Amino acid sequence: MQKLPAHPEVKENLGRLREAGVRLAALTNSTQQLADAQIDSSGLREYFDQVLSADTVRRLKPAPEPYRMAAENLGVEVGQVRLVAAHAWDVTGAMQAGCSAALVARPSMVLNPLFERPDVVGGDLREVADGILEAEK
């Protein structure tokens, strides 16, 4: 798991979000050491202001504490955070913690019909970035 490559459209669209003034942080259930290794091996470190581990608060996502910790580390209210994830459970956890959310709905990823739908859903990060930039207007 330490050397997973990013999907082809990821770098370009993280760059688009940064250029538009969106602050980016990575939040993972991995340990900080593994999170740092993953972000470095993927070549994505330059796009993120922070790389955060849920391990810091000793509660894993989808518990609310990791999302709240991310907001605190960014110096914003939890309602100002938008989690972008490829897993419906992560999106649901973020929304239940008070965040906005976006789902990268790659093939086989589906939303849980029992939970609220995030305001941005796209088939890849390009579509999600388009939706975020439109929502931020």
Where in this protein do the model-derived segments appear?
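Short, acidic loop-to-helix structural element flanking the phosphoryl-transfer center
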Residues: M1-A26, D36
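Asp-based, Mg2+/Mn2+-dependent phosphohydrolase catalytic module
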Residues: G15-R18, T31-Q32, D36-K137
